Design a protein with these regions (language model features):
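Hydrophobic transmembrane helix segments
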Residues: 18-76, 81-83
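Small-residue packing motifs within transmembrane alpha-helices
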Residues: 9-11, 65-77, 85, 110, ...
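Hydrophobic alpha-helical transmembrane segments of integral membrane proteins
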Residues: 19-20, 113-114, 143-144
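Juxtamembrane "helix-exit" motif on the non-cytosolic side of transmembrane helices
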Residues: 119-132
Length: 162
């Protein structure tokens, strides 16, 4: 039993509001505040690396540089993934499966950009506050899998029908 494209788009809109809106806002805020701060800390760690004299401070500066570089990279990848996901959602919501088919390559790139930040946030967020780890599931990006799966189904099955 197949549902109409109009019903599928309405269902996707509901899925987007329930499962994607909170994580996108939370991840964008996290990227804005934590990512921007990490850029500053990365620059500070770079200055520490340049001015370190002994091996202990050099190792500490290298460690800090690596940590903040990883945070900046994950933040950038997450922002790119969010942008691509919003682009795909707008295309499907406004123009349906035909527009989504034209952006098939963007869908797979979105998944590639999102994989590492999604794994990192899923693995690290529960350790941030063990008392609230269940609630952090809503903010970690795991719930984005529901609308992404819907888009994949649209690409796979409605795209093959023409």
């Amino acid at each position: 039993m197949a549902i109409s494209e109009r019903a599928s788009r309405i269902l996707y809109g509901i899925e987007f509001v329930i499962f994607a809106l909170i994580p996108i806002c939370a991840l964008a805020a996290w990227a804005l505040f934590y990512g921007a701060g990490s850029i500053l800390m990365f620059l500070f760690a770079l200055m520490m690396l340049v001015s370190s004299n002994d091996s202990a401070s050099l190792l500490e500066a290298l460690r800090n540089l690596a940590i903040f570089a990883a945070i900046v990279a994950l933040t950038g990848m997450g922002l790119i993934a969010i942008w691509k996901f919003l682009r795909l959602s707008a295309a499907f919501g406004n123009h349906g499966s035909k527009a989504l088919q034209e952006l098939r390559e963007t869908y797979w790139r979105c998944l590639a950009w999102a994989a590492l930040p999604l794994l990192a946030t899923t693995a690290l967020f529960p350790y941030a506050d063990p008392d609230f780890s269940g609630g952090l599931l809503l903010f970690s990006g795991v719930t984005l899998c529901v609308p992404l799966f819907h888009l994949w189904l649209e690409l796979r099955y409605r795209g093959n029908q023409g």
